[in-house]
Every structure is written in structure tokens, then in C-alpha cells.
Amino acid sequence: MDMITVNLYYKGQNGSARAFAEEMEKSGIADAIRAEEGNLRYQYFVPMDDPETVLLIDSWADQAAIDAHHVSPMMKQLAELREKYDLHMKIERFVSDEYEADHKFIRT
């Protein structure tokens, strides 16, 4: 099965999205999610043109890994932090097909 990547855009006010991401890192919740079976990437970014948004790139080996993550103890903690910081989200979901023809354009 192909890798699944979910981009989550957390939007807040007065620095709340960044404070959320910092608490996720400092509390160890982000590391616990990274340690879950099937997690391939869990990384926060701040768009240069929008300091009130934080982008989470969250990649998983397959849908079963995402389903297991959704019932993990970390999801309850994560949901509580989202509420604490009053965040709103936009989500994009991608399934990688590893298109071979693109590799000639990629410098690794």
C-alpha cells in the first residue's frame, strides 16, 4: 500500500498555533506519535507569509497505521491541546504513488 501524507494547517490567533506546536514538542506528545508503528513523519512548520498558521506534515505507512493512531492515548491529549489553544484546522490528504518518471528531476 502507498504512503499517506496528511497536511494539517492549524490556524490560531496571537501566536496560539505556534504555542500549540511548541507544547506538543515540549510535552513529549509529538515524540510519542513519532514512535507509533507506521508513523513516517510528524513535523511542524510555520509558513513565512502567515505567522498565525502552523503546518503539520504527518505521514503514515498505510491507513491501518492512521486508524491505530486515531484511537491512541495521544489523540485525547492532542484534542485537549487544540481546544486549549482554540485552533481551527484545514486538512489536505495525499497518497503517494512514487511516480518513477519524476525521479530524473529530483536531486538527492
For the regions a language model picked out, list residue spans one by one.
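Alpha-helical elements of the RecA-like P-loop NTPase motor core of helicases
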Residues: 18, 64-67, 76
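Glycine-rich beta-strand-turn "strand-cap" elements at beta-sheet edges
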Residues: 44-52, 77-108
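Short, flexible helix/strand-to-coil boundary loops that buttress conserved ligand/catalytic motifs
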Residues: 24, 69-70, 79-82
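Short N-terminal helix-initiation segments at or just after the protein's N-terminus
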Residues: 1-5, 35-38, 56, 88-92
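N-terminal/domain-start segments enriched in small and hydrophobic, helix-friendly residues
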Residues: 3, 9, 13, 25-26, ...
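Short, well-ordered beta-strand segments in beta-rich or mixed alpha/beta enzyme
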Residues: 4-11, 41-71
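Short amphipathic alpha-helical segments
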Residues: 16-40, 74
